[in-house]
């Protein structure tokens, strides 16, 4: 599913308990149930599972472990954009964003923390 931009007030309340002091949420995105947060220290993924949504997984991907990343901007027929992050351990994350999301802004934000 494609991610759409949401405000910080729409993130799951328990996320604030997991962030470390001095860590700021820069951008937030979500699908129907899952969320992806770009903070000043990491990419944080909230994966809501099951029919009731009571089971939730939290994944932290620190910028310090990003080996490289790339973006694919929206085109004429393909209006969605994409971000790929590759980590030093070989793991790869791919996020697809709905039309209208500033993928270049996300790229600039990540660059600020990993370069």
Could you tell me what each predicted segment is?
Residues 14, 63-71, 96-97, 110-115:
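Hydrophobic transmembrane alpha-helix bundles
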Residues 18-35, 39-91:
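Phosphoinositide-binding peripheral membrane targeting modules
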Residues 2-15, 44-58, 112-113:
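Charged, low-complexity, helix/coiled-coil-prone segments
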Residues 1-36, 92-93, 98-100, 104-105:
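Anionic N-terminal interaction surfaces
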Residues 80, 84-115:
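Short, Lys/Arg-rich amphipathic alpha-helical interaction segments
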């Amino acid at each position: 599913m494609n991610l759409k931009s949401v405000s910080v007030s729409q993130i799951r309340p328990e996320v604030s308990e997991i962030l470390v002091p001095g860590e700021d949420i820069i951008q937030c995105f979500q699908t129907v149930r899952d969320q992806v947060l770009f903070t000043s220290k990491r990419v944080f993924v909230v994966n809501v599972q099951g029919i009731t949504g009571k089971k939730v997984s939290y994944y932290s991907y620190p910028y310090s472990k990003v080996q490289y990343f790339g973006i694919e901007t929206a085109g004429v027929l393909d209006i969605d954009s994409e971000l790929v992050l590759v980590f030093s351990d070989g793991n790869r994350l791919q996020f697809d964003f709905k039309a209208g999301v500033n993928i270049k802004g996300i790229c600039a934000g990540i660059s600020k923390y990993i370069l």
